[in-house]
Regions:
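Residues within well-ordered alpha helices
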Residues: 20, 69, 105, 185-186, ...
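Mid-to-C-terminal Rossmann-like scaffold of FAD/NAD(P)H-dependent oxidoreductases
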Residues: 2, 180-184, 201-202, 211, ...
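N-terminal Rossmann-like dinucleotide/flavin-binding domain of flavoprotein oxidoreductases
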Residues: 39-99, 175-199, 208-211
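Hydrophobic beta-strand residues in large extracellular and virion-surface proteins
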Residues: 7, 28-31, 77, 93, ...
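Rossmann-like dinucleotide/flavin-binding elements
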Residues: 2-33, 129-176, 222-223, 239-281
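Predominantly flavin-linked oxidoreductase catalytic cores and closely associated redox partners
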Residues: 87, 91, 99-196, 203-205
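FAD-binding core/adjacent interface of flavoenzyme oxidoreductases
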Residues: 1-8, 23-24, 36, 74-141, ...
Length: 281
């Protein structure tokens, strides 16, 4: 009888790990739901730095190829999450009341978006995915993007093609990015304004139903007001998801929940590494 492995998370790391294990003769189940293990890769408009795609590829398409390859290898993917993990000699997995037993458990649950908090935020629509919600806005609208990393840059770029103006609010004195070409393209956009060393302090109303965003610049006593912004896109990083674990069994982890690089290529390699470690254990 083949050994059985269960993987929490159907992103690049989890699917790479599953594909390698299945190729080695393991029986592999992958559990994933939208709340805590759905891959952020599906939200990427274009991935230009993953090897094998010289012209880039949409995130959702790349993820679909990962899924197809895993399923072709014999991996079973289930659209439900794991509630808890109990481990002694075996790993007992609880999926909404149904119990399953496995020889090994891999956590590839990715991360969840970090929320932004300030007074009055309920006065303006807040979004955490430009690809998902950017289409809600048009050429007459102004939107604000909070953040200064790769996700904020790609989100601002995407939105700049949809709306009248994008105001990017960056807390630090510069942006931090891995794709200089994307950042240079963003800087060349005439409808993008980048406010460095600035934070959104609070949101108020102008009395006519329109939100007013109050930005505070470093070392300045007065705030700058943005009147008429229609939406706010928050891109300030993410936090690792966790699954409740009871027992002394080892937990294998791979992907974004175990490193801070947040790169598809690293996640895939990490998943492959964990699979090889399991096979050789």
């Amino acid at each position: 009888m083949s050994k059985k492995a269960v993987i929490a998370g159907a992103g690049p790391a989890g699917l790479a790990c599953a594909t390698y294990l299945a190729g080695a003769g393991w029986s592999v189940d992958v559990f994933s739901n939208e709340e805590n293990t759905e891959s952020c890769l599906a939200e990427a408009s274009i991935v230009k730095n993953y090897p094998g795609f010289p012209n880039g590829i949409e995130g959702v398409e790349l993820l679909g190829l990962f899924v197809e390859q895993a399923q072709n290898a014999g991996v079973a993917i289930h659209p439900e999450g794991i509630s808890s993990v109990h481990s002694d000699d075996k790993y007992i997995i609880d999926t909404n009341g149904a119990m399953h037993s496995y020889d090994e458990y891999v956590e590839a649950v990715g991360c969840r978006r970090r929320e932004y908090r300030c007074d009055g935020l309920e006065l303006i629509p807040v979004h955490y995915c430009a690809i998902c919600d950017g289409g809600l806005y048009g050429k007459e609208d102004v939107v604000v993007v909070i953040g200064g990393g790769d996700t904020a840059i790609s989100s601002a770029l995407y939105l700049s093609n949809l709306v009248k103006m994008v105001v990017m609010v960056v807390r630090k004195p510069n942006c931090r990015f891995t794709n200089k070409k994307a950042f240079d393209e963003l800087c060349s956009k005439r409808n993008v304004v980048i406010e460095y060393e600035t934070q959104l302090h609070h949101v108020s109303s102008n009395g006519k139903g329109n939100p007013v965003l109050h930005l505070m610049h470093k070392n300045q006593c007065s705030d700058e007001m943005i009147v008429g912004a229609k939406g706010l896109f928050v891109c300030i990083g993410c936090e690792s998801n966790v699954v409740e674990h009871v027992g002394n069994g080892r937990i294998w982890r791979c992907g974004d929940c175990s490193n801070d690089k947040k790169q598809v290529a690293i996640a895939v390699g990490d998943g492959a590494r964990v699979a090889l470690d399991i096979i050789g254990a």
